[in-house]
């Protein structure tokens, strides 16, 4: 028999999902950060949180491609302490883990693959 407090997935996964949503929500509110993130702000794609929850790897993507990835990562990392403070005010967690920002290149690889597939010759109609 399941208890009403049973969760469908582990606490770490729930916290990682919550952190992803909340980091995305606080980015526009960071003081002085908007100039470093314009013209298009990053999208938070995933948060990886180990079972001990002592650190969080925050993956982000950019709508305009990877050219600004290093610059944006530096801006985000420079504001990681401020982001943690804002998260601490918003979330009922005992401790907000240190945040480490990493560019998520999965979407770039997907776009490259779509481009390659678009340039393939059409398949022959009759196959033996």
UniProtKB/Swiss-Prot annotation:
Belongs to the RbfA family. It comes from Acidithiobacillus ferrooxidans (strain ATCC 23270 / DSM 14882 / CIP 104768 / NCIMB 8455). The keyword Cytoplasm applies. It comes from the Bacteria. InterPro entries: KH_dom-like_a/b (IPR015946), RbfA (IPR000238), RbfA_dom_sf (IPR023799), Ribosome-bd_factorA_CS (IPR020053). One of several proteins that assist in the late maturation steps of the functional core of the 30S ribosomal subunit. Associates with free 30S ribosomal subunits (but not with 30S subunits that are part of 70S ribosomes or polysomes). Required for efficient processing of 16S rRNA. May interact with the 5'-terminal helix region of 16S rRNA. This is Ribosome-binding factor A. GO terms for cellular component: cytosol. Monomer. Binds 30S ribosomal subunits, but not 50S ribosomal subunits or 70S ribosomes. It is found in: Cytoplasm. Keywords: Cytoplasm, Ribosome biogenesis.
């Amino acid at each position: 028999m399941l208890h009403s407090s049973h969760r469908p997935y582990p606490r770490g996964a729930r916290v990682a999902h919550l952190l992803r949503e909340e980091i995305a929500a606080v980015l526009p509110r960071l003081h002085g950060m908007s100039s470093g993130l314009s013209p298009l702000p990053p999208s938070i794609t995933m948060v990886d949180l180990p079972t001990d929850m002592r650190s969080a790897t925050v993956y982000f993507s950019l709508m305009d491609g990877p050219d600004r990835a290093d610059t944006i990562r530096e801006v985000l990392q420079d504001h990681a302490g401020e982001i943690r403070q804002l998260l601490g005010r918003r979330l009922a967690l005992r401790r907000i883990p240190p945040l480490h920002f990493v560019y998520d290149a999965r979407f770039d690889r997907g776009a490259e693959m779509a481009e390659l597939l678009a340039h393939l010759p059409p398949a022959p109609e009759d196959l033996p």
